[in-house]
Amino acid sequence: MIDQFSAHPPDGFQVLRLPQATPGFEAEFDLLTTVDGSLKRRIESLPLYRHWSKWLRVRTAFIGTTVSEYALFPAAWSARSLVKRLRKALGWCYPMMIIKDIPQHSPLLDDSANRYAERLLEACKAEGFVLVEGQALAYVPIDFTSVEEYLGRLSSSRRKDIRRKWRKREDLTIREVPTGDAQFQLDALIDEYYRLYLNVYDQSEIHFDRLSREFFEQMLRDAGSGGMVFEYRHEDRLIGYNVCFVHDGKLIDKYIGLQYPEARSFNLYFISWLINLDYALSHGLTHYVAGWTDPEIKSYLGASFTFTCHAVYVRNALLRGLARRFSRYFESDRQWSDRREPANRSGS
């Protein structure tokens, strides 16, 4: 998928050619993208916001991609050498540079990868980067023998609600279609998949990477990627899908497309969650990795979470100091997690 990202980057992105083929891109970044919703609304309600809001959009160099869970780094480079090289190459020519999605003690990575990430964060701090908590990555360890056992770990009220929603499964036809299947040679089907993806993108609170139709076409026609598409149809009409990939013994849930309002009427989010868990279990996988968005509903469904860190280098020294002081306001998922912990301890 990295090659597909490079060949067909999201709208408004330009791929960067970096040392040792480290993936990266440049894009206009809205500084309010990850700000807590209530604060964002207050800022947007300020006088003349539409006139001065352009100053909140900054041309930024990103190290990483939007199609991988974690940043990808060349094994041949030490963390310190890589960070120095990147800062010298990009730090002077962009107002802002972000090394995105650096793992923090991730249960999804081995000890070697986690140690490298620790050294990378230390090197970033030494080079003047501001460290900002990233989004919450949802995952479920496949440490149960049946979906019923998994549901048994949830509260009785949640079990009852999920089982009630699951009854809609009887009205659906569900197919597992590997990427590269002959059906994806039909341009009309690619168009339909892309339209359903845009439905989800348009109703999302965060708008950053709008994938292109060309990217979807290459992804769905790639037989060698390990991709599996879960199609949901009602009376032969496509009302939703998940595009997942099997990688390193894990089922990675990457993209979802939904037809509204049918997807809500048939509880597709809940049904697809259990379908994906069952697939991971039946194929002997170790984890289901469920992505970055909608942490509240994924928590309700029983997910655990691991956080990443973004290392931000601001070219202007004064603004760099301000970024360090106000960085906590850009950590909306961490704020959500901190609010969630007391509730969990109280048993709610």
List PLM regions with ranges.
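N-acyltransferase acceptor-side catalytic subdomain
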Residues: 1-348
